[in-house]
Each structure stands twice: as structure tokens, then as C-alpha cells.
Amino acid sequence: MQRLTLYHKVCSNMEEKEIIINGHEAVDLGLSVKWATCNIGATKPEECGDYFAWGETSPKNVYTEETYLYYDAANNRKLIDIGTEISGTEYDAARKQWGDDWRMPAEEELYELLRDCLWQWFTINGVNGYKVIGPNGNSYFLPAAGTSDPEYPEYNECGYYWTGSFSDEDCHWDALCLKFNDDEFGHYSTYSHPYEGLTIRPVTDKSN
């Protein structure tokens, strides 16, 4: 994986209010979108939930190039083109699992979360992760859910969260995700192979 950028910023405080959309709780962090308080497939903030390959809308048992729905083995191992921004489309797992009001975060929404929020390494019921505090003082918890890779699960050590954005520049052919841990790098944007199983924290429009 390739590390890109690290951001930090101090934020303020205000009372949080419960927001329920299609049966799922959202929190207004004072950003351009509201964020879900749980991962897809989770019922509590500290639960990992389900893992998804990028552009696939259902979890599965094995995550490899060969099992990836958009892997084109007959065409020099290239990927079937589903676009470079799938947030809100038919390839969006958040929209498929939670309904049209929810979607995967786009690139600019991830950068906003990194740039404008205070990130504090935190533990809930034995699960490590980050408490993310927005500019308005509201917060949510992102568990270190690791990946679906049985050899390097990294559960309780690292978190990997998909966005809906993809890069095909310079033969990169990888999708943008958030990665975090508690070491010197903290939290940053990076790219991951689209066939890997990562978690998703959905967003919803501010108007919802």
C-alpha cells in the first residue's frame, strides 16, 4: 500500500443529536455530509461489520483477484471498467445494503474528514480505533477492523475503509481508502487493490 497524506486539526464541542435514516443512525460532524455511526453489517459502533471488495455490493468468504467480480482474466488481468467514482451508483455497497439515502464516501469527503476533524486513538469494549471529533464537537467511533485477509487480518491494530473513488493513473489501478493505526503515521489516505475485502462507513447527504 502507498501512504499519501496525514492531517490533524483541533475541534470544538457541542451536544450530539440522534439522527435515524432508513433505520441506521447518522451523526452530523459539521462537515458537508453526515456519517453513519456504524459500519455496514454492524449493530454497534465498535463492531467490524462486513467486508466488501470495491464495487461489489455483497460480502463473501474469499477475497482474491480470481473471486473479484470485475477481474478480467481473459484480458491481460485488467479490470472490467465500472467507473472511477461509484459513490451512489449501482456498484455502491452502502446504497445496496442500506437504501438510496446512503452511499460510500467520495474522495473529497474522506479528505474533509481527515483535514477538519480531531482524531483520538480510543478503545470501546476492548476494541481499538479512532474517536473522530468534528468541527462542531460531535463525534463517532471507527473500529480498527483490519481486512478480510486471513494471513494479515490486522484486527484491533489497523482500520481500512473504502471510498467510492478509484485511480487508474500511471497503471495504479487501485481504489482510494482510509487507513489508520496508532503509530507515528496515525491516519491517512492510501490506495488498495480493489479485490481486497475492506469495511465501509457510509455517508448521507446533509439534507437527509
Model features per residue range: what roles?
Residues 1-13:
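Short, Lys/Arg-enriched N-terminal segments with co-localized hydrophobic residues
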Residues 11-208:
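Conserved positions within compact, well-structured domain cores
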